[in-house]
Amino acid sequence: MQTETSQGPLTGPEGDGPVPTGGPQWRALLEMRWRARLQEVTGLALAYHEAEAAAGRGGGEDRLQVQRLLRLQRRTVTSRRALADTEEALARLSAGRYGWCESCAAAIPARRLAATPETRYCARCARGRGR
C-alpha cells in the first residue's frame, strides 16, 4: 500500500526503499507539518498567557486555574518538541541524510516515513531505543 499526497506517492525508488534525497513530496509533507505545528505552538502559548493573565486577575489562583495552566504548559512543551523534530527532519532532508537511520545507517522504508515523517531510526533501531 502506498501513501499519497497531492504531489504523488510517498515512496522510494523501489516502492519501499530509500527516499530519493531531497524528494519534493517529502519536503512538501514536512513543511506542511511544520506550519501546522508552528500554528499549534503559537496558539498554545497564547492560550497559556491568556489563562495566566485571567488567573492573576482573579486575585487568587484556585486549583482549577493551576491545573489548566499546567495542562497548557505540558501541551506546549510537547508541541514544541514535535516542532523541533520536524525542523530536524527538514535539516536532514536538506543535508541529504533524510530517510537513513541515524543509528545503523540503513535505509528507512518509505512506508515508515509516511507514517512518521520525522523518524530518525529504522524500526529495528527504534525498538532497541524503546521508541
Where are these regions (language model features)?
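Interaction interfaces in information-processing and related assembly proteins
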Residues: 1-95
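Short cysteine-rich clusters marking metal-coordination/redox-active sites
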Residues: 101-104, 122-125
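Short metal-coordination and nucleic-acid-contact micro-motifs, chiefly zinc-binding Cys/His arrays
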Residues: 94-97, 118-121
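Short alpha-helical
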Residues: 36, 108, 120
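Alpha-helical hinge/cap motifs
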Residues: 95-99, 105, 109
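A short beta-strand motif that forms part of the nucleic acid-binding face
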Residues: 117, 126
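Short functional micro-motifs and their immediate structural scaffolds
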Residues: 108-109, 127-130
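Short Cys/His-rich "knuckle" micro-motifs
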Residues: 111-116
